[in-house]
Regions:
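Extracellular adhesion/carbohydrate-binding repeat motifs centered on closely spaced tryptophans
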Residues: 2-271, 392
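Extracytoplasmic cell-surface/polysaccharide-interacting catalytic and binding patches
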Residues: 257-445
Length: 445
């Protein structure tokens, strides 16, 4: 009886152990059979190795890399392991490369470690903090701009303001030369445009941000800036032309008083020497003279334009003769004196004053004749008082008809179709188009 009872108990224990083994997964298998694989139980995934033992730590499979915690459970989401941060997808695979997680973008190296700070790839630089940043960021005390894809921007950046970012992504400040032009950037890096006073002078930066040089028309006024961009003031020589520039108004125009002396400027600001009864030259005035044809002298500035004009006139079939060019103060005085004496001799009863008035009606007072400038010349036609070709084309060479028809009330001189004055093409062409005489054009009428 006891033996029978013992056998029954042994069988019961064996059955119980089998039940427990099945429940806990303790099953004795053949050691040569692969028992590895995933099991889902107790709300998670677990992995058994070849021998059926549960795995912890890192797991490499052909599907990816996984991590199983101390509880044998497969990790998902964020996990810090040995001081490094990793992320595992819902299926447990470790993330590498770029990943979008909860609306943010992260980068993981090939070992799955989340990267922070600077990352460079495919020619672009990125900054992770720890997710990918974009827009303005202050890094190591310096501002940088990152595009929506996270790449750091260099070169020109146009937002509400315009910036230029150097090779390190840092906005330039102060004056900077870029692609052959100079720009000025404020302390916040924005590109400045408009007037600005710096330690070395006054500058103007155009709407595109580039520094103004040479002539610029700003708000209806003409200013001149040197090659270095500094605003020029005072007298300026630009080729054969002269200008007077002020700090606020740029090139002066019209009639101006400078150092108690009258000066006259065109609408473009070019100074023109005006000589008439109201604006006489001093006795000492002598221009730089050169020989024209062995008989006449002219101011050096008009020699080549005059030769070109006369040569082209001859080519066009025009015939001319030059009667007068430069005449000194003394020569003008002698001519007036001779004319005065001639009237007295012709009419002994003529009073001294009347003789002078008759002479002055025909001969300009010394200092008031344009011939003293060396810039004018009397050119007649062959047997006639004028050369039609010159009347039509003189403007193209920088000459004007000094005393045009219908302007005697302004110039004080009757129409003289032979009297030409050199002013340069920058003056002669717009003056021709204006229809004004010299006094009108210079604001002296």
């Amino acid at each position: 009886m006891k033996t029978k009872t013992r056998k029954i108990l042994i069988k019961a224990v064996i059955v119980l152990l089998c039940v427990v083994a099945l429940t806990l997964g303790w099953i004795i298998f053949d050691a040569t059979v692969d028992r590895s694989g995933w099991r889902e139980t107790r709300g998670g995934y677990y992995y058994r190795d070849f021998h059926g033992h549960q795995v912890t730590g890192w797991l490499e499979t052909k599907y990816g890399r996984y991590y199983l915690g101390d509880d044998y459970k497969m990790v998902t989401g964020w996990k810090k392991i040995d001081g490094e941060v990793y992320w595992f997808a819902e299926d447990g695979t470790m993330a590498t490369g770029w990943r979008d997680i909860a609306g943010e973008r992260f980068y993981f190296d090939p070992q799955g470690r989340r990267q922070e700070g600077w990352v460079e790839m495919e020619g672009s630089r990125y900054y992770l903090n720890p997710s990918l940043v974009s827009g303005w960021q202050e890094i190591d005390g310096q501002r940088r701009w990152f595009s929506p894809d996270g790449s750091m921007v260099t070169g020109w950046l146009i937002l509400d303001e315009t910036y230029y970012l150097d090779e390190n992504g840092v906005p330039l400040t102060g004056k900077a030369d870029i692609d052959g032009s100079t720009y000025y950037f404020l302390e916040d890096g924005s590109c400045f445009h408009g007037w600005i006073d710096l330690e070395d002078g006054r500058y103007y930066f155009l709407p595109d941000g580039s520094m103004a040089t040479h002539w610029q028309e700003l708000n209806g006024k003409r200013f001149y800036f040197g090659d270095d961009g500094t605003l020029a003031t005072g007298w300026l020589e630009d080729g054969e032309y002269r200008y007077y520039l002020t700090y606020d108004d740029g090139a002066l125009t019209g009639a101006q008083i400078l150092d108690d002396k009258a000066y006259y400027f065109t609408p473009d600001g070019i100074y023109v020497l005006l000589v008439n009864a109201d604006n006489p030259l001093p006795k000492s005035y002598v221009p730089e003279l050169v020989d024209l044809d062995g008989r006449h002298e002219v101011a050096s500035v008009c020699l080549e334009p005059l030769k070109n004009m006369l040569t082209d006139c001859m080519k066009a079939g025009g015939e001319y003769s030059i009667n007068n060019t430069y005449r000194s103060y003394a020569e003008q005085k002698d001519i007036l004196q001779t004319r005065y004496e001639r009237y007295l001799e012709a009419d002994p009863e003529l009073s001294d004053n009347d003789a002078w008035q008759k002479a002055l009606a025909e001969v300009a007072r010394p200092g008031t004749s344009e011939h003293q400038t060396g810039l004018c010349m009397d050119i007649n036609g062959a047997g006639v008082e004028s050369v039609p070709w010159l009347l039509e084309h003189c403007w193209e060479y920088g000459f004007i008809l000094r005393f045009p028809e219908g302007k005697k009330d302004i110039t004080g001189i009757v129409y003289e179709p032979w009297h030409f004055r050199y002013v340069g093409t920058r003056v002669s062409i717009p003056m021709r188009d204006s229809g004004l005489c010299l006094e009108e054009y210079l604001g002296a009428a």
